[in-house]
């Protein structure tokens, strides 16, 4: 019997040059500019992957909707989508936009249209002008001959008001005429595809076919974003891999319904993480079901954290904290990690403006001597709190060097001040750069 060191498998592993690498290069796509006033958000091209969100208010309630949009924008949402489903909602859109402008909130608004968008855009020009982008669902824009006419009316409105569109296909509202035709064609094949593959192909054909029709109607390729949303993780990955291969349009990623709590977060992360790692995706929306009474901003934070943990963007300083074990019977490190994370998020609206680059800072809060000092040295700022039976002292590391040891009841306050001082010292104020 060969020893492990002599086995062919072991020899092969040891002699093979390691191949390391991060995410794949971004898929090439048309850049789509979305504007409101002086605010420009570009989707696709070489722009960063964008985070967007959607309100759940009654859009006819202009004040309530504007308040929620402001909350989402303050959390970091770069575009906010609102439902435009009734004449009352369409009539409220200019008032919503006006209130946001008065509050200094310039985030572009996306109108979400289903069934009657062609009528609302025609009858409420103030709505058409106040929105920065239109979402069109080709599966419910109309049936039969009306579908082509009503789709054309929406594209003509987009061209008239110089607005980009997202042609968003959902498997829950897929064009049934297209699906029936494709099922019939599949039945005539010598080797028919399975039903799932036909569904995937129908989603892709609906999206690309509608986009090409929009181009024929005069809308530029740089005014079109596509999406093909489904609820299953593997389904989303399969559809977007093929969609990305077959077109050059900017792509919007997201599950149709991710679900609640940890399940929704895990599903979204699993699906989007794979696609983003492969360079597929230009903007994302995390469709979480919030807990009753919970803030809508959770979906924005999850989207940001997906991009930041993958190294694609930076939004706020990252707090690295150990999970705890039998060595960490004290809850001090957990409490400190939570306090520091909350403190950093609270400071970011000001720090983002005054201290550019601070969003890339890493802070480590560790619970014992095993990994604490080592992990702390790899962060910009780190603290290693004492575990069970350890000396009741907490060494602090800055840029890899031990600079101080904290003791006593005010460790949290003192460490927070160290973080604040580090930010002020290491990240230049914007006025100093101008």
Swiss-Prot record:
Free-text cofactor note: Binds 1 [4Fe-4S] cluster.
Residues engaged in binding [4Fe-4S] cluster: 322, 325, 368, 375
Known catalytic reactions: (2E)-4-hydroxy-3-methylbut-2-enyl diphosphate + oxidized [flavodoxin] + H2O + 2 H(+) = 2-C-methyl-D-erythritol 2,4-cyclic diphosphate + reduced [flavodoxin]
Any one biological process term the GO annotation gives: terpenoid biosynthetic process
Domain of life: Bacteria
EC number(s) reported in the record: 1.17.7.3
InterPro entries, A to Z: Dihydropteroate_synth-like_sf, IspG_bac, IspG_bac-typ, NO2/SO3_Rdtase_4Fe4S_sf
Disordered, as annotated region: 1-24
HAMAP family (UniProt xref): IspG
Entry-linked PANTHER family: 4-HYDROXY-3-METHYLBUT-2-EN-1-YL DIPHOSPHATE SYNTHASE, 4-HYDROXY-3-METHYLBUT-2-EN-1-YL DIPHOSPHATE SYNTHASE (FERREDOXIN), CHLOROPLASTIC
Family listed: Belongs to the IspG family.
Job of this protein: Converts 2C-methyl-D-erythritol 2,4-cyclodiphosphate (ME-2,4cPP) into 1-hydroxy-2-methyl-2-(E)-butenyl 4-diphosphate.
UniProt cross-references to NCBIfam families, sorted A to Z: ispG_gcpE (TIGR00612), PRK00366.1 (NF001540)
Name under which the protein is recorded: 4-hydroxy-3-methylbut-2-en-1-yl diphosphate synthase (flavodoxin)
Taxonomic source organism: Burkholderia cenocepacia (strain ATCC BAA-245 / DSM 16553 / LMG 16656 / NCTC 13227 / J2315 / CF5610) (Burkholderia cepacia (strain J2315))
Lineage: Bacteria, Pseudomonadati, Pseudomonadota, Betaproteobacteria, Burkholderiales
């Amino acid at each position: 019997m060969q020893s492990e060191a002599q086995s062919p498998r072991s020899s092969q592993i040891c002699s093979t040059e390691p191949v390391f690498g991060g995410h794949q290069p971004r898929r090439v796509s048309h850049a789509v500019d979305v504007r409101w006033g002086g605010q420009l958000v570009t989707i696709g091209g070489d722009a960063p992957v964008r985070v967007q969100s959607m309100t759940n208010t009654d859009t006819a309630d202009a004040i309530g909707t504007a308040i929620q949009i402001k909350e989402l924008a303050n959390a970091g949402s770069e575009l906010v989508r609102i439902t435009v489903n009734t004449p009352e909602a369409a009539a409220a859109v200019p008032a919503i936009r006006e209130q946001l402008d008065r509050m200094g909130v310039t985030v572009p608004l996306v109108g979400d249209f289903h069934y009657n968008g062609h009528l609302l855009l025609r009858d409420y020009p103030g709505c058409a002008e106040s929105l920065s982008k239109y979402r069109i669902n080709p599966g419910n824009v109309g049936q039969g001959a009306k579908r082509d006419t009503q789709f054309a009316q929406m594209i003509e409105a987009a061209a008239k008001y110089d607005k980009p569109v997202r042609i968003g296909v959902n498997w829950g509202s897929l064009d049934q005429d297209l699906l029936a035709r494709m099922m019939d064609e599949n039945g005539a094949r010598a080797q028919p595809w399975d039903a799932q593959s036909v569904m995937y192909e129908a989603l892709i054909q609906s999206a690309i076919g509608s986009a090409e029709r929009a181009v024929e109607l005069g809308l530029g390729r740089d005014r079109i974003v596509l999406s093909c949303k489904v609820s299953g993780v593997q389904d989303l990955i399969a559809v977007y891999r093929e969609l990305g291969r077959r077109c050059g349009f900017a792509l919007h990623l997201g599950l149709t319904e991710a679900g609640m709590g940890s399940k929704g977060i895990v599903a979204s992360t699993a699906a989007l993480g794979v696609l983003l790692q492969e360079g597929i995706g230009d903007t994302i929306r995390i469709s979480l079901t919030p807990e009753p009474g919970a803030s809508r901003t959770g979906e924005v934070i999850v989207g940001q954290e997906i991009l930041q943990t993958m190294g694609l963007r930076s939004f706020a300083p990252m707090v690295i904290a150990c999970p705890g074990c039998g060595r960490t019977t004290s809850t001090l490190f957990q409490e400190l990690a939570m306090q520091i994370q909350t403190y950093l998020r609270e400071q970011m609206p000001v720090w983002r403006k005054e201290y550019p680059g601070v969003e890339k800072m890493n802070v480590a809060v560790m619970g014992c001597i095993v990994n604490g000092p080592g992990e702390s040295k790899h962060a910009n700022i780190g603290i290693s709190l004492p575990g069970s039976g350890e000396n009741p002292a907490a060494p602090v590391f800055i840029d890899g060097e031990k600079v101080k040891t904290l003791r006593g009841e005010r460790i949290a306050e003192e460490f927070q001040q160290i973080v604040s001082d580090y930010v002020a010292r290491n990240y230049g104020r914007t006025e100093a750069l101008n």
